[in-house]
């Protein structure tokens, strides 16, 4: 890795540690009777210049979020009923930016998941926190209180000029603080 990718010893050690952790998690998956659940939240603080995902700026769609969650809850009930006999291995709430939801909405969604599915075989429950400008202490507390095992923060870049150009309304410092 050092020669091919010009990676530092520190980054090489980090990559190896992550690979070992992931290998341990993957070895626990039940590939025959298990499944993973992806839940999409299509709202973001703003639309990034490069983004190809289906997402909507929250400012324009805020009054539709609860209706979206109502529909999502019905879909979760359907999926849970269809898969009751299978082992739920992992859950990923992605987007968009799920942490654009208000704390009570995020809590509502996670509680619905916890009530609808058997999580006894779930080895990882991830919420994409995507953008540091959407993370608050209250939202982090909701995630902790609901047993979320992993969050994903994706700044896209650590160069402020690039963040500004691509439409990310957060700073490099906010990413570090997150």
Briefly describe each language-model feature range.
Residues 34-36, 48, 124:
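Structural motif
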């Amino acid at each position: 890795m050092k020669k091919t990718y010009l990676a530092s010893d520190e980054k090489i050690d980090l990559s190896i540690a992550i690979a070992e952790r992931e290998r341990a998690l993957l070895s626990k998956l039940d590939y025959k009777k298990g499944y993973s659940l992806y839940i999409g939240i299509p709202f973001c603080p703003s639309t990034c210049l490069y983004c190809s995902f289906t997402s909507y700026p929250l400012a324009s769609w805020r009054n539709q979020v609860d209706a979206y969650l109502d529909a999502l809850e019905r879909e979760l009930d359907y999926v849970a009923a269809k898969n009751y006999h299978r082992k739920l291995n992992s859950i990923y709430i992605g987007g968009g930016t799920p942490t654009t939801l208000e704390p009570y909405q995020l809590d509502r969604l996670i509680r619905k998941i916890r009530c609808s599915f058997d999580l006894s075989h779930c080895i990882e429950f991830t919420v994409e926190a995507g953008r540091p400008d959407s993370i608050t202490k209250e939202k982090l507390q909701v995630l902790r209180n609901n047993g979320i095992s992993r969050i994903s923060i994706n700044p896209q870049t650590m160069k402020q000029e690039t963040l500004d150009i691509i439409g990310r309304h957060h700073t490099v410092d906010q990413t570090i603080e997150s």
